[in-house]
Regions:
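Short aromatic/hydrophobic "clamp" motif used to bind/position activated sugar donors
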Residues: 1
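Active-site acidic Asp-centered loop
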Residues: 4-5
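Conserved donor-nucleotide/metal-binding helix-loop-beta segment in metal-dependent transferases, i.e.
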Residues: 8-47
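Catalytic core and acceptor-binding pocket of nucleotide-sugar-dependent glycosyltransferases
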Residues: 50-155
Length: 155
């Protein structure tokens, strides 16, 4: 299932290719890593910061429905005890509890989407736009306006 919130934009017709990569979960990477230390500290497990994923922003993400359903049935007790956004839960706790839950690596997540620091992501992605983006109106709108204009859109 493609999660495409109203503040997303798709640049390329690549949905089938991304579905065929076999990931259970993929979303744009989080470029700011400071929240991870707070996440591990709030769980009272500071050692977790070494295991946390920087991949999986949920507003523009692709999720394997069957795996999410199965893991929801198992994880609902744990999920109900946390106050984290669902994307943080799925990209981190599920991956730690179920190592076979397949989450994209950083490079693939970058090709999939950008959110935070889009210009930095663009450079890290070899100056290529991703499949799509999330929260473009919050993060460097000047960068995004140029990209949209090149695609024939004027916002």
């Amino acid at each position: 299932m493609l999660i495409h919130q109203t503040d997303c934009f798709v640049f390329k017709n690549e949905l089938n290719e991304w579905c065929n990569k076999g990931y259970d979960y993929i979303g744009p990477p989080w470029i700011h890593k400071e929240w991870m230390e707070g996440f591990a500290r709030n769980l009272k497990m500071p050692f977790l910061k070494n295991y946390l994923s920087v991949v999986g922003n949920g507003g523009f993400s692709l999720r394997k429905v069957r795996k999410f359903y199965l893991f929801s049935k198992i994880n609902w007790v744990i999920a109900s005890k946390t106050n984290f956004n669902e994307d943080v839960f799925w990209s981190n706790l599920t991956r730690i509890l179920f190592p076979r839950f397949k989450i994209a690596k950083f490079k693939d997540a970058l090709a999939f989407g950008f959110e935070d620091e889009p210009e930095k992501c663009y450079i890290m992605n070899d100056k290529n736009l991703p499949f799509g983006c999330h929260a473009w109106e919050k993060n460097d709108t000047n960068f995004w306006r140029k990209c949209f204009k090149e695609c024939g859109y004027d916002f």
